[in-house]
Amino acid sequence: MAALTCITCRVAFRDAELQRAHYKTDWHRYNLRRKVAAMAPVTAEGFQERVRAQRAVAEAAEASKGAATYCTACGKKFATFNAYENHLGSRRHAELERKAVRAASRRVELLNAKNLEKGLGADGVDKDAVNAAIQQAIKAQPSTSPKKAPFVPTDECGRAAAGARGVPERDPTEKPPRLQWFEQQAKKLAKQQWEDGEEEGEEEEEDDEDEDWEDIDSDDGLECEDPGVEDQDAEDAAAEESPPLGAIPITDCLFCSHHSSSLVKNVAHMTKVHSFFIPDIEYLSDLKGLIKYLGEKVGVGKICLWCNEKGKSFYSTEAVQAHMNDKSHCKLFTDGDAALEFADFYDFRSSYPDYKEGQDPAELEALSTDKILECDDETMELILPSGARVGHRSLMRYYKQRFGLPRAVTVARNQKAVGRVLQQYRALGWMGSTGAALMRERDMQYVQRMKSKWMLKIGMKNNATKQMHFRAQVRF
């Protein structure tokens, strides 16, 4: 019987060197742990099998770290599959997945509504196919944040991913859509002014010059006409009638992908869902033209309705719509000279004191230019064309001549669409800019003035008492 043994591992050795080397091995340490746990020792072959199995598990974990898992619904990247499984069971992922399903369902319903308008019924549609389409739309939905997007190492993969998301490639040297749209509007305005100037010049020439007209044959007249000019005019007219590429139709929402069956329903949707309102709607004369212009501004120019040229540039309609929804910019900017942008769609003649209902605008302009100022000899007051009264300075020593501005504001006859929208605004509690709103504004101005005076008074009073570190610069 050998004298050198290991009781823990139940093995014998020929010499002391092998015994000391055995005590330093992992096999002996493993059996020591098993002995402490009151478990039987394992043989050398069994220990090697367990080591190989543990190495396989470690290699699989390393491989899973290299192949990261990505959640499309949440836009998150996970290093291990276990973390990905834990994320799938979280409440946050379930909420985002439900939102994605609802968004995809709304998109499918919108497409179905458009198909119904085109005459394509939904009969015979397979429900399984619809569900598969919804799941495919969820998987194809892009990430909401560029920081959460999966990493793409090569340019080819980047171009493929951009094409899959539907984002067109953009040339860095290309001008932003906003700048291009502003240039187009400037060209249209210059062209319109030039045409108006030509028409005025032709009218003046016809009035000043008396030319002798000669009778010519019909064949000669046809020979003088240039067919190329007529073709060019027809092309220009067709270009003006057709909407620009990318413009939002008047039946689609300016701030989301909602589609309505009519213009009035579209405006009602934008009012209720996005709190969009049209300023001075009682004087609006062309609702369709205004919504069409705003659709071109958002769809073609990619411009925020509130930021205008001051905000950052956008390169897609979805981006500018998301910006307006996130920043609560679903409103028109009409402060100062910005209101002149929408002047063509309004008619404020009904607010003029000398306006008569049913009067021709041309006659009104002629009367306004030839109008004579009225003067009252008894009160020595001068009545201006705007209705304002001006007193004489010789009477200033007796009393202060302060005349109000009487304005009889009447609501002009407008289109049926504008009337319906106005009724919707009033049903939502809109009161306009008169009455209690003006009184409240004046009260707030008075409160602000009193607060400013009080703050100035307190500041002046504490200016002399709160100088804790003041030191006189005389008599050192």
Curated annotation (Swiss-Prot):
Residues 137-243 are annotated as: Disordered. The keyword Nucleotide-binding does not apply. Pre-60S-associated cytoplasmic factor involved in the cytoplasmic maturation of the 60S subunit. Residues 167-177 have a biased composition (Basic and acidic residues). Homo- and heterodimer. Associates with pre-60S ribosomal particles. Interacts with MELK and MYBL2. Interacts with DNAJC21. Its main location: cytoplasm. The modification N-acetylalanine is found at A2. Coiled coil: none annotated. This is Cytoplasmic 60S subunit biogenesis factor ZNF622. Disulfide bonds: none annotated. GO terms for biological process: intrinsic apoptotic signaling pathway in response to oxidative stress; positive regulation of apoptotic process; positive regulation of JNK cascade; ribosomal large subunit biogenesis. One of its GO terms (molecular function) is zinc ion binding. Phosphorylated by MELK. The phosphorylation may redirect the protein to the nucleus. The modification Phosphoserine is found at S275. PANTHER family: CYTOPLASMIC 60S SUBUNIT BIOGENESIS FACTOR ZNF622, ZINC FINGER PROTEIN 622. A zinc finger (U1-type) spans 4-28, 69-93. Pfam families: zf-C2H2_2. Keywords: Acetylation, Cytoplasm, Metal-binding, Nucleus, Phosphoprotein, Repeat, Ribosome biogenesis, Ubl conjugation, Zinc, Zinc-finger. GO terms for cellular component: cytosol; Golgi apparatus; nucleolus; nucleoplasm. Belongs to the REI1 family.
